[in-house]
C-alpha cells in the first residue's frame, strides 16, 4: 500500500472506528465498511470532512452464492476444459421449478458506493450491508450526493434493495409489469416469462419461457505456439 493510502486508511480508521467502521486494503484500493445505522453520518463526513465530493457509482450486491462456481479448475490442457458440467448455482433452474437454496454466511445484500475526491485525487469504496435479508433497506444518500438518484433506482430495480427517503424510488430498467428483481441470485437465469409478437392479436404477448437452461463452458481454440500439441512440435522439429 502506498504512503498516501496508508495515511488515508489511518484517517478513516480514526474517524469511523467508534461507529463500527472497518477499513480494508486490496489491489491498491481502500474499502470502508460501515453499519447501516451509521451510513448517513458517515457519508456526510466523507463529503464534508475528507473531501469526497463526488459519488461516481453505486451498485447492489447479492452474496447469496458468493464463491459457488459451476466449473473451476487450476489446470488446463490443449484438450480444453471438461464439457460435462453439473449445474450448481441457485438461479439455474427451469420455469416453475423449485430450486434448493444454499446456505450463506453473513448478510446477503450490500450496497457499494464508489467515491472520488477531486481535490485530493483519491478514490474510496464504501460498503454497507443490509440488516434484513427479507426486506433489505438502507438510507438514501441523494441528499449527500445528488448523483445517487438514478443509481439507487437501478439497485432497487435489479436487486430489490429499498432506499429509505429516496424522492422517487421506482423501476428504471425493467418495464412496469416486470415481476421480481433480475440480479438476485434466486432469480432464474431464463426469466419467468418471454415476449413475442402475436400477429393474430396484433400485439406483444407474454408466455412462459421456452428456453431450457444449460451450463456454458468457454471453449477457446488458439493456433499459436503456446497451444500446439507436443506431437506437432516434434514433427516440426524433425522437418
UniProtKB/Swiss-Prot annotation:
Q: Which InterPro entries match?
A: NADH_DH_suC, NADH_quin_OxRdtase_su_C/D-like, NADH_UbQ_OxRdtase_30kDa_su, NADH_UbQ_OxRdtase_CS
Among SUPFAM superfamilies, the record links this protein to: Nqo5-like
Q: Which UniProt keywords apply?
A: Cell inner membrane, Cell membrane, Membrane, NAD, Quinone, Translocase, Transport, Ubiquinone
The source's domain of life comes to Bacteria
**Which cell locations does it reside in?**
Cell inner membrane
Q: Which reaction does it catalyse?
A: a quinone + NADH + 5 H(+)(in) = a quinol + NAD(+) + 4 H(+)(out)
Known EC number(s)?
7.1.1.-
Of the GO CC terms on this record, one is: plasma membrane
Give this protein's Gene Ontology molecular function annotations.
Answer: NADH dehydrogenase (ubiquinone) activity; NADH:ubiquinone reductase (non-electrogenic) activity; quinone binding
The record's listing under Gene3D superfamilies reads: NADH:ubiquinone oxidoreductase, 30kDa subunit
- Entry-linked PROSITE patterns: COMPLEX1_30K (PS00542)
Q: How does it sit in the membrane?
A: Peripheral membrane protein
| Complexes and interactors | NDH-1 is composed of 14 different subunits. Subunits NuoB, C, D, E, F, and G constitute the peripheral sector of the complex.
Indicate the family of this protein: Belongs to the complex I 30 kDa subunit family.
Q: What does this protein do?
A: NDH-1 shuttles electrons from NADH, via FMN and iron-sulfur (Fe-S) centers, to quinones in the respiratory chain. The immediate electron acceptor for the enzyme in this species is believed to be ubiquinone. Couples the redox reaction to proton translocation (for every two electrons transferred, four hydrogen ions are translocated across the cytoplasmic membrane), and thus conserves the redox energy in a proton gradient.
The name of this protein is NADH-quinone oxidoreductase subunit C
Lineage summary: Bacteria, Pseudomonadati, Pseudomonadota, Gammaproteobacteria, Chromatiales
Amino acid at each position: 500500500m502506498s504512503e498516501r493510502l496508508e495515511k488515508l486508511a489511518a484517517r478513516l480508521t480514526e474517524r469511523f472506528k467508534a461507529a463500527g467502521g472497518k477499513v480494508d486494503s486490496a489491489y491498491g484500493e481502500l474499502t470502508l465498511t460501515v453499519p447501516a445505522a451509521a451510513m448517513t453520518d458517515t457519508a456526510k463526513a466523507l463529503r464534508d470532512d475528507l473531501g469526497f465530493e463526488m459519488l461516481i457509482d453505486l451498485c447492489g450486491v447479492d452474496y447469496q452464492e458468493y464463491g459457488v462456481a459451476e466449473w473451476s479448475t487450476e489446470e488446463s490442457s490443449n484438450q480444453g476444459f471438461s464439457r460435462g458440467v453439473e449445474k450448481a448455482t441457485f438461479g439455474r433452474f427451469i420455469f416453475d421449478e423449485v430450486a434448493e437454496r444454499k446456505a450463506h454466511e453473513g448478510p446477503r445484500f450490500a450496497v457499494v458506493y464508489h467515491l472520488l475526491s477531486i481535490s485530493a485525487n483519491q478514490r474510496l469504496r464504501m460498503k454497507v450491508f443490509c440488516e434484513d435479508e427479507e426486506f433489505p433497506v438502507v438510507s438514501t444518500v441523494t441528499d449527500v450526493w445528488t448523483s445517487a438518484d438514478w443509481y439507487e433506482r437501478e439497485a432497487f430495480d435489479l436487486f430489490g434493495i429499498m432506499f429509505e427517503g429516496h424522492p422517487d424510488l421506482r423501476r428504471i430498467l425493467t418495464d412496469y409489469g416486470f415481476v421480481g428483481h433480475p440480479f438476485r441470485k434466486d432469480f432464474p437465469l431464463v426469466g419467468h416469462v418471454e415476449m413475442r409478437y402475436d400477429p393474430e392479436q396484433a400485439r406483444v404477448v407474454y408466455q412462459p419461457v421456452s428456453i431450457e437452461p444449460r451450463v456454458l463452458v468457454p471453449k477457446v481454440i488458439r493456433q499459436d505456439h503456446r497451444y500446439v500439441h507436443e506431437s506437432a512440435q516434434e514433427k516440426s522439429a524433425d522437418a
